[in-house]
Amino acid sequence: MSNQHTLLISNLLPVGSNISTWWNFGSMLLTCMALQTSTGFFLAIHYTANINLAFSSVTHILRDVPYGWIMQNLHAIGASLFFICIYTHIARGLYYGLYLNKWVWLSGTILLIILMATAFFGYVLPWGQMSFWAATVITNLLTAIPYLGPTLTTWLWGGFSINDPTLTRFFALHFILPFLIISLSSIHIVLLHNEGSNNPLGTNPDIDKIPFHPYHSYKDMLMATTMITMLFITMSFMPNLFNDPENFSKANPLVTPQHIKPEWYFLFAYGILRSIPNKLGGTLALLMSVIILTAPPFTHTSHVRPMTFRPLTQILFWMLIATFITITWTATKPVEPPFITISQMASTXYFLFFIINPILGWIENKIINK
């Protein structure tokens, strides 16, 4: 164990004095993970992974179990809060060039993929209409894989359609994957403290450092408290803010919802999938929407690390954020004009960010050298 890890345990780890609030989202994600694991455990005690009883067991938790409604709402809204924090965490990494710490960034991307899989499995568990049909549509994408597709789909379903074995294995995966996420998170943190965190200026942080405790630990506590307060306000006054009305009806394989869509935090990937009128092409675009995050560490060309002093790249970054929001919005709409065109244009602009960013870095280098 290195000296830095010893300091980390005793809370004396030296940290750059100028790291901003954007650096608090890592600890907020840790808080979210603790909340999701604890509430998930209590929900698992009362949940029944059976297609005839799953929907009733969720209703039972909400109505009959003491404080069950708090557990269920905390878990459901907590998932949305988790993704708000993680998307902000990723955006911060892109803006400040933190992806140059390659292994931290790549381990984070793997964490994101596993987290998305875990959230998807969890969305299926209540066995409501939207849960069932979202699972049908997304798992069906496996059939787009040449030769192996149909076999893989049958293997995942545990039969020739989504049924009891599918729900059982999804519950098992949703229960076990968070422990893998916790393990990988610890690796992510160890890798981060191996090189140390960067700062908003992108300068050498060794020049001016202060102890992590009490300065940054109190800042972490403030942000975590603010986040939990927001969570409880949402749970108390708007518990169904992120829920789909279709999911209040039990899953019916004979009735298709008018508009099938996953949870809001997957809409950007779902929008990219829908924008391509080809099953295999759409599936590849869906995968690439997340996997492309592994590209920036290898395509960074600028001599300056953060976007703080790069106005051209800043414009491109905020275009990416606007594009992300636009794709999310179009994915909530029916597949008809003008939403198809908007979705296709926004999806193209999303991928263009990762191509134009290194070119802009090279142009900025030329301007600086002049």
Curated annotation (Swiss-Prot):
Its cofactor is heme b. The chain crosses the membrane at residues 25-45, 69-90, 105-125, 170-190, 218-238, 280-300, 312-332, 339-358. CDD domains: cytochrome_b_C, Cytochrome_b_N. Heme b b566 binds at H89, H188. It comes from the Eukaryota. It is a multi-pass membrane protein. Pfam families: Cytochrom_B_C, Cytochrome_B. GO terms for cellular component: mitochondrial inner membrane; respiratory chain complex III. Heme b b562 binds at H75, H174. A ubiquinone binds at H193. Keywords: Electron transport, Heme, Iron, Membrane, Metal-binding, Mitochondrion, Mitochondrion inner membrane, Respiratory chain, Transmembrane, Transmembrane helix, Transport, Ubiquinone. Binds 2 heme b groups non-covalently. Its main location: mitochondrion. GO terms for molecular function: metal ion binding; ubiquinol-cytochrome-c reductase activity. GO terms for biological process: mitochondrial electron transport, ubiquinol to cytochrome c. PROSITE patterns: CYTB_CTER (PS51003), CYTB_NTER (PS51002). It is found in: Mitochondrion inner membrane. The keyword Transport applies. Belongs to the cytochrome b family. Component of the ubiquinol-cytochrome c reductase complex (complex III or cytochrome b-c1 complex) that is part of the mitochondrial respiratory chain. The b-c1 complex mediates electron transfer from ubiquinol to cytochrome c. Contributes to the generation of a proton gradient across the mitochondrial membrane that is then used for ATP synthesis. The cytochrome bc1 complex contains 3 respiratory subunits (MT-CYB, CYC1 and UQCRFS1), 2 core proteins (UQCRC1 and UQCRC2) and probably 6 low-molecular weight proteins. Heme 1 (or BL or b562) is low-potential and absorbs at about 562 nm, and heme 2 (or BH or b566) is high-potential and absorbs at about 566 nm. This is Cytochrome b. It comes from Micropechis ikaheca.
